[in-house]
């Protein structure tokens, strides 16, 4: 009897538990039916435990919402909100399936505040949270029959697998609307979506006003984002459904190259689109790209009929009118207000009584983001496209765009941007008088210009002949220049340098050597005198008759280090005098030959000793300490103490040369930039440097400053102390030497980073302090990095208290394959000052 009672009690308990579970979610199921209710503390979890649905409260708020977020990611990252316009005021709300089969949210009074508001075939429905983050309401008997899904009702986040519908024929689109603020999920004033009335392109609106657009889709990329061709692994994986649905609808979707990655696009409350990837190693979101990211990406930044060019400084004029146009308000343009745009100098002649030969014509602009509001006509032939535009007097321009076809513009040409790489050619309609005049006078003008051209050509040939004759005579006299002449600082500067660098700068007192004298010193560039080779050309050892050894950098005709870098090095290094900077002895400029002559460094470069196990023993701790200090003093001289404020931009182990006494000398100033002393940073489109040494703001945004050199110096410190290359950690859990340093630091094991060759030295404290300083120098944010004056003080003052470094994130991003870089040379141990790697950010 007692046993029977115990069994009865157990059965009763199970029945009660079952009844409770019919009213609340007692498991981590990914679905629920009419018999279940999601209340406070309950949640749905996707099958792979990637996403979670439940109740949440935003930061700095007391209101409650139902949303979807990434499970096990902190801080909580919400990707969808149901009741964003009608929050719950307390914790008494519930999510359930109503009697009509709709998914609803009710408050404590059982009033519906949000509903899917569809008409299911029956009320036998089920809500399922898929591993893509999509919440679906479907038939419980046939789960292939979907009635509603969150992916079709997005808030501010676009996830891989989401299909964004647009119907150009009906002018319908699906917009992503950001939160009003980080604590208020209600709809903000911005929106992002596919343009429903024009070309298939992404647009960000501020109310009804456009803020940014991507340019039309050409079946591979959005034409206004040419970088999509170079960021294929993670950043872009867009696809367009083809053919359209019966009603004309098409769908954009995004497919990640690695389905295990968490990627998300979202639009911030301030109207900026961003893309992130979750870094599992450091458990942080890596920012991959954002739009608009430059001045010229802002919508119609320069006004109508004007082109914006980010490679130019804004103060000096990023904006320029198209040929044949002029500023509407010249006084505003003089004050750098370009919003008024440009207007035609001469009206078009279409449909007017014309003088023969005065018909309108076209001028071409290349590398352009095509204007907004273009129309696509079904022609794929350039001449046919031109004829279509020429016959239409309202046509302002045309372009034949690969993947789209013939596009014409009948409205004002707006939102044009020039790209360094990529872009399209657009043909602008101009009055015939702006294209060279009428046919009646064309023969006369051809004759006149031909005569003038022939005269000028003959004059140029004569001047060039006289110049080369004088130059050869000069160089012949200089064949016997000796190194002792150089040491005595005799002035051998002459016209070739003036021709090279121009009269606008002070010409350095730099000796010029003839090609024959350099060839003689290097044994006609003998193979046995070759010291090394890189993307720039070849380096040779040379000996003058007095016995003085030199190193000769002979630039090849195909050198990536072109005339500008050659000029840069002559102008900079010839003016700099410091014991920790390499000394330039002279140059050779003859015909197509460009050569630089340096003092010879018998121990060559730091990387040969640092990363070669057979030579590491030559660098004991005392010598490494002196090398670190010498480099720091050389950098401080460049940044603060020289006549010029110079940012090196390519500081690395292979550009640190070692003399006979192993004293370090910074070399290779081909990529350096001069700042004035009130300037703290600059921008560039052409990002140059070396993989593993580039600061995040420089690699990602083209912004560089003395803090960029500080970052490179920090990497160099860590390499010197550890004896390991920064890039040797690529593909590991740490991502880079910086990540490895942080890993050991956070676990209190910094000592393990010290090179075993010097680990047993009595100066371990000194080595650990260097690691600490290196980590401070490689912090992600510019404002957190010390300047070189502070760095030198930290190194030399062993008693001062150092601030703790911040956890790095950028190092892992660079090493994850998210950024693709062009390598113009191989990363090998260099010789003397000559091997360098130029990297262009892609």
Swiss-Prot record:
The UniProt entry annotates the active site at 650 (proton acceptor)
GO MF, one annotated term: protein serine/threonine kinase activity
Give the top-level enzyme category. Answer: transferase
Extracellular side of membrane: 23-443
Residues with the Phosphothreonine modification: 684, 837
- Species source reads Arabidopsis thaliana
What is the membrane topology listed in the Swiss-Prot or TrEMBL record? Single-pass type I membrane protein
Upper classification of the source organism reads:
Eukaryota, Viridiplantae, Streptophyta, Embryophyta, Tracheophyta
Specify the protein name. Putative G-type lectin S-receptor-like serine/threonine-protein kinase At1g61610
Q: Which residues are glycosylated?
A: 7, 23, 35, 60, 110, 123, 304, 351, 380, 441
Q: Catalyses which reaction? A: L-seryl-[protein] + ATP = O-phospho-L-seryl-[protein] + ADP + H(+); L-threonyl-[protein] + ATP = O-phospho-L-threonyl-[protein] + ADP + H(+)
| Protein kinase domain span | 525-814
| Cellular component terms (Gene Ontology) | plasma membrane
**The entry's keywords:** ATP-binding, Cell membrane, Disulfide bond, EGF-like domain, Glycoprotein, Kinase, Lectin, Membrane, Nucleotide-binding, Phosphoprotein, Receptor, Serine/threonine-protein kinase, Signal, Transferase, Transmembrane, Transmembrane helix
Question: Where does the protein end up?
Answer: Cell membrane
């Amino acid at each position: 009897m007692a046993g029977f009672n115990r069994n009865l009690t157990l059965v009763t308990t199970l029945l009660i538990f079952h009844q409770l579970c019919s009213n609340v979610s007692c498991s981590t199921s990914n679905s629920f039916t009419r018999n279940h209710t999601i209340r406070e503390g309950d949640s749905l979890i996707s099958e792979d435990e990637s996403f979670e649905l439940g109740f949440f409260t935003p930061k700095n708020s007391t209101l409650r919402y139902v949303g979807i977020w990434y499970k096990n990611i902190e801080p909580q990252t919400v990707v969808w909100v149901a009741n964003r316009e009608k929050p719950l005021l307390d914790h008494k709300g519930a999510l359930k399936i109503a009697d009509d089969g709709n998914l609803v949210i009710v408050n404590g009074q059982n009033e519906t505040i949000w509903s899917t508001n569809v008409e299911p075939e029956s009320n036998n429905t089920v809500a399922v949270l898929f591993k893509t983050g999509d919440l679906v309401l479907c038939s419980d008997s046939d789960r292939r029959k979907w009635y509603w899904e969150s992916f079709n009702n997005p808030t501010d986040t676009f996830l891989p697998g989401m299909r964004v519908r647009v119907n150009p024929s009906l002018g319908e689109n699906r917009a992503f609307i950001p939160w009003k603020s980080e604590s208020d999920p209600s709809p903000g004033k911005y929106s992002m979506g596919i343009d429903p009335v024009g070309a298939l392109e992404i647009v960000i609106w501020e109310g009804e006003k456009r803020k940014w657009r991507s340019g039309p889709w050409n079946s591979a990329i959005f034409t206004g984002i040419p970088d999509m061709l170079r960021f294929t692994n993670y950043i872009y994986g867009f696809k367009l459904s083809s053919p359209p649905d019966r009603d004309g609808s098409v769908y954009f979707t995004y497919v990640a190259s690695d389905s295990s990655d968490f990627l998300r696009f979202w639009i911030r409350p301030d109207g900026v689109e961003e893309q992130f990837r979750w870094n599992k190693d450091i458990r942080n979101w890596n920012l991959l790209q954002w739009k608009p990211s430059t001045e010229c990406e802002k919508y119609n930044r320069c006004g109508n009929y004007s082109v914006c060019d980010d490679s130019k400084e804004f103060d000096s004029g990023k904006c320029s009118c198209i040929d044949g146009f002029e500023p509407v308000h010249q006084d505003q343009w003089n004050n750098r207000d370009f919003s008024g745009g440009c207007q035609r100098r001469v009206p078009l002649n279409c449909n007017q009584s014309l003088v023969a030969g005065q018909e309108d014509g076209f001028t071409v602009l290349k590398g352009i983001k095509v204007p907004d509001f273009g129309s696509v006509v079904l022609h794929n032939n350039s001449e046919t496209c031109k004829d279509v535009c020429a016959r239409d007097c309202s046509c302002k321009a045309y372009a034949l765009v690969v993947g789209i076809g013939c596009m014409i513009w009948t409205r004002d040409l707006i939102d044009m941007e020039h790209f360094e790489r990529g872009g399209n050619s657009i043909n602008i309609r101009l009055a015939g008088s702006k294209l060279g005049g009428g046919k009646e006078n064309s023969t006369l003008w051809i004759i006149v210009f031909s005569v003038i051209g022939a005269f000028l050509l003959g004059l140029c040939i004569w001047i060039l002949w006289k110049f080369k004759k004088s130059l050869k005579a000069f160089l012949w006299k200089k064949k016997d220049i000796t190194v002792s002449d150089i040491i005595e600082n005799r002035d051998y500067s002459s016209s070739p340098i003036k021709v090279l660098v121009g009269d606008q700068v002070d010409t350095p007192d730099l000796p010029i050597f003839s090609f024959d004298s350099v060839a003689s010193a290097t044994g006609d560039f003998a193979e046995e005198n070759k010291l090394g080779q890189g993307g720039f050309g070849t380096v040779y050892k040379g000996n003058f008759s007095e016995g003085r050894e030199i190193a000769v950098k002979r630039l090849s005709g195909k050198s990536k280090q072109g005339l500008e870098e050659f000029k840069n090095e002559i102008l900079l290094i010839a003016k700099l005098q410091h014991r920790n900077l390499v000394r330039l002895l002279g140059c050779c400029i003859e015909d197509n030959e460009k050569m630089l002559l340096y003092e010879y460094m018998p121990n060559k470069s730091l990387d040969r000793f640092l990363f070669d196990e057979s030579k590491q023993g030559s660098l004991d701790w005392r010598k490494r300490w002196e090398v670190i200090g010498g480099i720091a003093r050389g950098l401080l001289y460049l940044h603060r103490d020289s006549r010029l404020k110079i940012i090196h931009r390519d500081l690395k182990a292979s550009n640190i040369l070692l003399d006979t006494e192993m004293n370090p000398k910074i070399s290779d100033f081909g990529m350096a930039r001069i700042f004035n002393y009130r300037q703290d940073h600059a921008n560039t489109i052409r990002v140059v440097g070396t993989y593993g040494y580039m600061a995040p703001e420089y690699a990602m945004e083209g912004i560089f400053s003395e803090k960029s050199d500080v970052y490179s110096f920090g990497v160099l410190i860590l390499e010197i102390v550890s004896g390991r290359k920064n890039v040797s950690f690529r593909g590991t859990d740490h991502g880079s030497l910086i990540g490895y340093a942080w890993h050991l630091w956070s676990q209190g094991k910094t000592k393990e980073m010290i090179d075993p060759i010097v680990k047993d030295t009595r100066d371990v404290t000194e080595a650990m302090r260097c690691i600490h300083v290196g980590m401070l120098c490689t912090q992600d944010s510019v404002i957190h990095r010390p300047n070189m004056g502070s760095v030198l003080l930290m190194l030399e003052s062993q008693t001062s208290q150092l601030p703790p470094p911040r956890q790095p994130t950028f190092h892992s991003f660079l090493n994850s394959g998210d950024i693709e870089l062009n390598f113009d040379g191989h990363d090998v141990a260099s010789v003397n000052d000559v091997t360098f790697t130029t990297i262009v950010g892609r």
